[in-house]
Amino acid sequence: MWISYLGFLIFYFILAAASYKILKRIKWI
């Protein structure tokens, strides 16, 4: 259970970081 929760948290963090990068790139344009 803990491993699954940790994996989900890491996946969500990576997704948020990717979305932030994309938004930043769009802002530059």
From Swiss-Prot:
It comes from the Eukaryota. GO terms for cellular component: chloroplast thylakoid membrane. The chain crosses the membrane at residues 3-23. It is a single-pass membrane protein. The keyword Plastid applies. Its main location: plastid. Keywords: Chloroplast, Electron transport, Membrane, Photosynthesis, Plastid, Thylakoid, Transmembrane, Transmembrane helix, Transport. GO terms for biological process: photosynthesis. It is found in: Plastid, Chloroplast thylakoid membrane. Component of the cytochrome b6-f complex, which mediates electron transfer between photosystem II (PSII) and photosystem I (PSI), cyclic electron flow around PSI, and state transitions. PetL is important for photoautotrophic growth as well as for electron transfer efficiency and stability of the cytochrome b6-f complex. The 4 large subunits of the cytochrome b6-f complex are cytochrome b6, subunit IV (17 kDa polypeptide, PetD), cytochrome f and the Rieske protein, while the 4 small subunits are PetG, PetL, PetM and PetN. The complex functions as a dimer. Belongs to the PetL family. This is Cytochrome b6-f complex subunit 6. It comes from Cyanidioschyzon merolae (strain NIES-3377 / 10D) (Unicellular red alga). The gene is petL.
